[in-house]
Design a protein with these regions (language model features):
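Mature catalytic domains of secreted/periplasmic carbohydrate-active enzymes
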Residues: 1-397
Length: 397
């Protein structure tokens, strides 16, 4: 039974802060149509059944108390699409008693062949579109989220009139409650580059993108929610992925799946603590940085696109990713160096646009390192013991 009887929003928020997160985006409503917030537009909510509490509202207070940004995700616009197959089998979707929960689930398998992504699914009725607009606006009015994450169906042509209205309402309303306008996450071609932030689900980009973007993925290798006998990404995988994304002007939104009782699996907490420990030492190479003229160097490449993040090869000591902040350049080595020297080819004395190096520091190590900027690269002498288990960030000035 879903009761979330052990849900502790304060503990959750503290864990997220300790992990190094800067913003938290819980699911306000997923494709099942169940609102995890205090909605006045539905009886199928966490306030009126199950946990019998405003999960989103309670978490919003706790997250903001930790100094983090708070957002929400809504997947309601896909609701009648995901549940449409229920029309073809004996299921609760066909029971009029649950019509308010399942909505006008449309049997598109029988009645229409889906058109290519972002074209018009004509069965998205104006009534369903207006319902999405009302519920999305309700989230804005109740919780003033800094981020609104939407799944891909907001890109359907039949939804766009409501999307335009929502974006104007959200951006204008958010300015009343904060110093800056909120952000909308979109997928594919639902919005323009300058109007919102592109999101790639379980994927990355192969090159620097001039506009900010985001990867959303799950710490689980198999699922977005909690399942038994799950397997999880390692701290090294998460850190390497984060570094690669940031070097290309992106952010990482990492999903975790809590149990139905409101607790977060210990294995997940351990990964988050490890990532947070790395960021406590190396965070200056991540937070508030911008890409360099190239994202990095090395043999390991990442293909652009969604739904392939677990296909990435293991990074080596020859793989570096670059970030900048002011006059400081950071080179993050994704594999542990095997000897007493590491070489960054992009910073050779003859390379076009390469910096003239005055000092090199390994974050987490006192003092500066000896280096030689030569025609074949920047040669850095390493300490006898290189601390840490994961990526190694060099501060270069």
């Amino acid at each position: 039974m879903f009761k979330a009887e052990h849900f502790d929003p304060t503990a959750w928020a503290h864990l997220f802060a300790e992990s190094g997160a800067k913003y938290v985006v819980p699911v306000a409503e997923h494709h099942d149509g169940f609102a995890m917030y205090d909605s006045g537009l539905s009886d199928w909510t966490a306030v009126k059944m199950g946990p019998r509490r405003d999960v989103i509202g309670d978490l919003a207070k706790a997250v903001r108390a930790e100094g983090l940004h708070f957002g929400v995700s809504s997947h309601r616009v896909e609701h009648n699409f995901f549940l449409g197959v229920g029309r073809t089998i004996p299921s609760d979707v066909n029971d009029p008693r649950y019509a308010a929960f399942y909505g006008p689930a449309h049997n598109w398998l029988e009645n229409q062949t889906p058109t290519p992504l972002n074209n018009d699914f004509t069965f998205v009725s104006s009534a369903w579109r207006d319902d999405w607009l009302a519920r999305s606006s309700e989230l804005v009015e109740k919780y003033h989220p800094d981020i609104m994450y939407f799944d891909w169906w907001i890109g359907q042509a039949s939804v766009r009139p409501a999307l335009t209205r929502f974006a104007a309402f959200y951006y204008n309303t958010s300015l009343k409650y904060g110093d800056q306008a909120g952000l909308i996450n979109y997928k594919d071609y639902a919005m323009q580059d300058h109007s919102a932030v592109l999101d790639l689900e379980r994927g990355q980009l192969g090159e620097i993108r001039p506009f900010p973007w985001q990867t959303d993925t799950s710490i689980s290798n198999k699922s977005w929610g909690y399942i038994e006998h799950d397997t999880f990404k390692s701290p090294q995988f998460v850190i390497d992925q984060l570094v690669d994304i940031v070097s290309k002007n992106g952010n990482l939104l990492m999903n975790i799946g809590p149990r139905s009782d409101g607790t977060i699996p210990v294995e997940v907490q351990q990964v988050l603590h490890e990532v947070g420990a790395w960021l406590k030492i190396n965070g200056e190479s991540i937070y508030g940085t911008r890409p360099w003229k190239t994202y990095g160097e090395g043999p390991t490449k990442v293909a652009s696109g969604s739904f392939h993040d677990t296909d990435t090869a293991v990074y080596t000591a020859e793989d570096f990713r670059f970030t900048t902040k002011g006059n400081t350049l950071y080179a993050i080595e994704l594999g542990k160096p095997s000897g007493r020297e590491t070489v960054i080819r992009s910073f050779s004395s003859g390379a076009e646009g390469a910096p003239k190096v005055d000092s090199v520091t390994l974050l987490g190590v006192d003092g500066t390192l000896t280096f030689h900027q030569q025609p074949d690269g920047l040669h850095i002498e390493l300490p006898a013991e290189v601390p840490g288990k994961y990526a190694y960030a060099f501060r270069i000035r």
